[in-house]
Amino acid sequence: NEGHMKVEGETAYCVDINTGFKNGYKTRHDASASMSAAQIEDVALSLEYVKQYRDSHSNLNANQGYLLEQCVVWQRLSEQLGWKCDNVRAAYSEISQDIQNEVYAGARVFVQTNKGRYKCGGYIYTGEGQDLGQFWAELNVGNAKVKKTTANESITKANAMYSIAGATFGIFADQ
């Protein structure tokens, strides 16, 4: 009923499915004060998947995209917090069952295959009415100097085909 929620111009989501919406002032807290890093990463990566899906599927309008995002937030929080509504969905008249099945299954796979590849965070806004949340996932990037060595110089020495020029590397480590 409340539509597309925003805090200071940025999209926000209901993070308390059992409380009604009220306009008003809220206080912002870092999500890590009430959620584990794994929970934040789960929600943030799920949202990242839905945003990427939405951006690549022009058949979804902005309201449908936001509704899918809100549903995935509720699904992930329900599983984490024991709300017993893990399969919350939009009405099929709003978004088809096939699209919802694809998005929700895709989000789960995306989370599993991308854990640790993104820096994730969030804020929780508390006050009158339901709590709101904002979550983000930023792809970890950086620079590295690559040194190529070989155990078999007879194959690699003066071999123009043996090159790493133009290669793309993904390097991940704990901070």
Residues of each region from the PLM?
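Solvent-exposed loop/turn and edge beta-strand elements of beta-rich ligand-binding domains
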Residues: 41-56, 64, 131-175
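Short, surface-exposed polybasic-aromatic patches that bind anionic ligands, especially phosphate groups
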Residues: 1-136
